[in-house]
Amino acid sequence: MSHVELAGVVKRFGTFEALRGIDLEMPGGAFTVFVGPSGCGKSTLLRLICGLEVPSEGTIRFDGRDMRGVPPAGRKLAMVFQSYALYPHMSVADNMGFALRMSGMPKAERVVQVAKAAEILQITRLLERRPKELSGGQRQRVAIGRAIVRAPSLFLFDEPLSNLDAELRVEMRFELAELHRRLRTSMIYVTHDQVEAMTLADRIVVLHDGLIEQVGSPAELYERPMNRFVANFIGSPRMNLLSGRVAALHPGGIEISIPGIDPASLTLPLRESAKLKVGDSVEVGVRPDELRIGEGGAVRVAMKVEFSEYIGGAMYLHAPHQEAGRLTVRCPGVQAPPSGTITLGIERESCHVFAMDGQRLS
């Protein structure tokens, strides 16, 4: 398993800077997920690690060894793409063993390696079929099997589930997690889907405009986002953000005035390093699942339900709000959607405070 380190990595395409100083360490055996919107640099970063691109600046090390000048074939890694890239005229077994054949491995050894990988992926019965006889999920398993047979120290996945329907994506997420548990090999996975990131990763790397916004476990990113971008990107539906102003400053705390809440202000803890003064604008964030219908909570806000979304085990209520634009609340369980105006309670410990530049203050 490879321990991957990136130090000061910059990548330019002409005058465009796709990656702007990436410092990152990925422990051996970890399942690391790069997540972010389209164009954030996550696939470019994966291509640099793979060796398909060369950094404009900075270094990439595998187990302490500088990879500059080392071609992809010399990095002991395997890559799985969004496209399955299977040879249509070959059987599943021949597709999986093709790289081993090109490397000169004897046929008897190839057969053993392919059989082991097929057993792990539960596709032994498919080994004699052609790709056209397989479903999308089966083709993706073959593509993953083609990577497994090479016994790499590092797996790279570039949005491998994007071509699958919703049900198959859920199934393949489970299979990838189980594969990592069995192999304990380093894996780096690129996706724009934060659900994939949250369910698969040991550590998530959130990228935006060529920069790393935050690195942490799924729970750390969800419960303690370091800025507004991460707060909005991680979690679905996105975090509710209420605009307010600093009404008073206390030792280790801040009193925030927010129009439309009762009482009219909310006192929250403040980071010692935060530099604020009375009158400054701030935003208070609350996750939809942290809002409670009823009169409880440190403060309350009234909302008129505009529409509801029933998703089986829960219901999402949406309502316009003068400061948030729209408030969303998650109601667990099956119940009839409330109509008219309802009251929501907000607890202090559920709140996140952000400066107007997006950085976390609480």
Each model region followed by its residue ranges:
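The feature captures the beta-strand-to-loop junction immediately N-terminal to the Walker
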Residues: 35-37
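Helix-to-loop junction immediately C-terminal to a conserved catalytic motif
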Residues: 50
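ABC ATPase nucleotide-binding domains
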Residues: 72-229
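Non-catalytic connector elements of ABC transporters
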Residues: 237, 248-362
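Conserved ABC transporter NBD signature motif
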Residues: 58-66
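ABC ATPase nucleotide-binding domain
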Residues: 5, 25, 61, 343-345
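Conserved coupling/switch loops of ABC nucleotide-binding domains, chiefly the family-specific signature
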Residues: 56-59, 109, 209, 243
